[in-house]
Amino acid sequence: SINYKNMPHQHLLTLLSLLPVGSNISTWWNFGSMLLACLMTQIITGFFLAIHYTANINLAFSSIIHLSRDVPCGWIMQNTHAISASLFFICIYIHIARGLYYGSYLYKEVWLSGTTLLIILMATAFFGYVLPWGQMSFWAATVITNLLTAIPYLGTTLTTWLWGGFAINDPTLTRFFALHFIFPFIIISMSSIHILLLHNEGSSNPLGTNSDIG
């Protein structure tokens, strides 16, 4: 055993060493916590980016250039937001892969809430990708939103509502910014439900070891 008494931050080390999880938990179980860390990073940096962003098709790109060049530490916020978004998806795909490998899909409520989270996350990332309103943003907005027209009966109406008219324009960007801002809070709510369901069901135990260390 390790003696923590003569070490700095002994209380924190003791707390971490007594984390009540079973011996079957490995590094692959860390990615859920890493996803929460990514989410918090995105919300904090996103808030500061939103302060300086202008949701207008003529000013959006200029506002991002201004953010990068003129706002103190703006380039750090922008790059952290972009890199953390990529890390978010790396973590979530590893998180899903671990769930598939160890049969976590057998816990239906946890798995379905997680699947819903993935869909919302992908939608959030798409809306964020469009916000700079560069050439690729316009192309992505046009192509992806046109997929809604494939929905029977409601498709055309949904697309027109999302565009705010009959073509991609200023109202579209305003809607995308509003949705990109509100979706992370929906993700927080869904994550809380996901965690509550997980604690109700319990995690998978691939080694079949006794996880009761009390």
From Swiss-Prot:
Component of the ubiquinol-cytochrome c reductase complex (complex III or cytochrome b-c1 complex) that is part of the mitochondrial respiratory chain. The b-c1 complex mediates electron transfer from ubiquinol to cytochrome c. Contributes to the generation of a proton gradient across the mitochondrial membrane that is then used for ATP synthesis. Keywords: Electron transport, Heme, Iron, Membrane, Metal-binding, Mitochondrion, Mitochondrion inner membrane, Respiratory chain, Transmembrane, Transmembrane helix, Transport, Ubiquinone. One of its GO terms (biological process) is mitochondrial electron transport, ubiquinol to cytochrome c. GO terms for molecular function: metal ion binding; ubiquinol-cytochrome-c reductase activity. This is Cytochrome b. Its main location: mitochondrion. It is found in: Mitochondrion inner membrane. CDD domains: Cytochrome_b_N. Binds 2 heme b groups non-covalently. Heme 1 (or BL or b562) is low-potential and absorbs at about 562 nm, and heme 2 (or BH or b566) is high-potential and absorbs at about 566 nm. One of its GO terms (cellular component) is mitochondrial inner membrane. It is a multi-pass membrane protein. It comes from the Eukaryota. A ubiquinone binds at residue 199. The keyword Cytoplasm does not apply. The gene is MT-CYB. Heme b b566 binds at residues 95, 194.
